[in-house]
Amino acid sequence: MNLYEYLLEGVRHFTLIDPDKSVDYLKIAKYALEAGTDGILIGGSLGIRESQIAQVVKDIKNISNVPVVLFPGSLTQLTDLADGVLFLSVLNSLDPYFIIGAQIQGAVLIAKHYPRLEVISTAYIIVGDGGAAGFVSMSKPIPYTRPDIAAAYALAANYIGFKAVYLEAGSGASQPVPPEMVRAVRRAFPRVLIVGGGIKSGEIARAIARERPNVIVTGTLAEESPEKLGEIVRAIKQA
C-alpha cells in the first residue's frame, strides 16, 4: 500500500512535529505513537534547515512503524528519508509565489534530488485565524462562517486534479475548522481531506471526525499537552 492509499482509508490521526519548536521531538513522537497516532507530519513555517529535517525524520523512523510525511514550509524542508511529501499549494494566498512559484522550484528539486519521495499534491486552504502559516504565506483566510467559500475552493481543487485538500485553521488556533465547513468541503472533494488547527479536545476531534475527513492533525497540542493525544485518538477512532 502506498501513502496515498493509506491516507484514503477511514479517518486517521496524524501528529505534526515542528522541529523549530520541538527540541525534544522524539519525546513527542513517542507520546504520539503510544497514543495510537496513524502517522507523523514533519515541518513548520519558519527556521528549519534541510540537514535538520533529515535528522529528525531519520530519528523518528527509527522508533516508528507509521508513515513519516513531510509538511514543508519552505524549499529547505525536503529529504528522501521520509515516506512522502505533501506538495502544498496555498490556494488562498495573495502572493503567486505560494500558489505556484515555490512549487516550480520544489518540483525540480524533488525530481533531481529526492525522486524516491511519494508526492501528494495538496491544495492548502487557510481558514479562520490562519496562524503563522497564514501570515507567512500572505493568505486571505476564509471566515469560519463561510463554508460555502471553502467548498468552492475545494471544488476548484478537485477539478484541477489535486490528490488532497488540507483545511488549516493555523497552529494554536483559537477555534478549529467548524464541522459544517468540513462537511461542505467533504461533499465537494472526493479524495484525501485533511483537517488541522485548534483541535484541543476529544469532543472537538469527534465532531470533526463524524464529517469523515481522511486525516485529522494535531500539532500544538502534541507540543504543549502530549498526554492528551490519547483522548484525541480515541475520539477519532470511536466517531
From Swiss-Prot:
UniProt-listed GO biological process terms: glycerophospholipid biosynthetic process
InterPro entries per record: GGGP/HepGP_synthase_I, GGGP/HepGP_synthase_sf, GGGP_HepGP_synthase, GGGP_synth
Chief site of localization: cytoplasm
Keyword terms: Cytoplasm, Lipid biosynthesis, Lipid metabolism, Magnesium, Metal-binding, Phospholipid biosynthesis, Phospholipid metabolism, Transferase
Catalytic activity, reaction form: sn-glycerol 1-phosphate + (2E,6E,10E)-geranylgeranyl diphosphate = sn-3-O-(geranylgeranyl)glycerol 1-phosphate + diphosphate
Cellular location(s): Cytoplasm
Binding-site positions, sn-glycerol 1-phosphate: Y166, L167, E168, A169, G170, S171, G172, G197, G198, G219, T220
GO CC terms, sorted: cytoplasm
Protein name, per record: Geranylgeranylglyceryl phosphate synthase
Organism of origin: Pyrobaculum aerophilum (strain ATCC 51768 / DSM 7523 / JCM 9630 / CIP 104966 / NBRC 100827 / IM2)
